[in-house]
Amino acid sequence: LLDNPLIRNGIMQSQHFKTISAYWDNLDVALVGIGSPAIRDGANWHAFYGGEESDDLNARQVAGDICSRFFDIHGAMVETNMSEKTLSIEMNKLKQARYSIRIPMSEEKYSGIVGALRGKYINCLVTNSSTAELLLK
């Protein structure tokens, strides 16, 4: 997440970024985490997104994120004012990976996991027994 879209666009035009992002077209395995606004009071979430951005995500009913790409409980992508400042793999490229693996393990991640499953952003889920039991209810 960059300070403004101009920085993001400049980086995206660089040859170094183009070389790296070309690999995204041929991913075999993607191993990434799932974020959740339910953990917004946590130090990491607050440090990364801040209070104002967190409030905006809640207002837009964001269920979770993968690589700062936000989605709702139904799996639909949610555009935010951070979208144009985000420099990360696009969700459609993650969905093309042969194995798209997520390893979330807490009740706080429930809405993010459900949204990711419904959006088909996951084809392999590794979690603990308590989170799995919650998902099966």
Q: Residue spans of the language-model regions?
A:
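Conserved phosphate- and dinucleotide-binding cores of soluble alpha/beta proteins
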Residues: 1-137
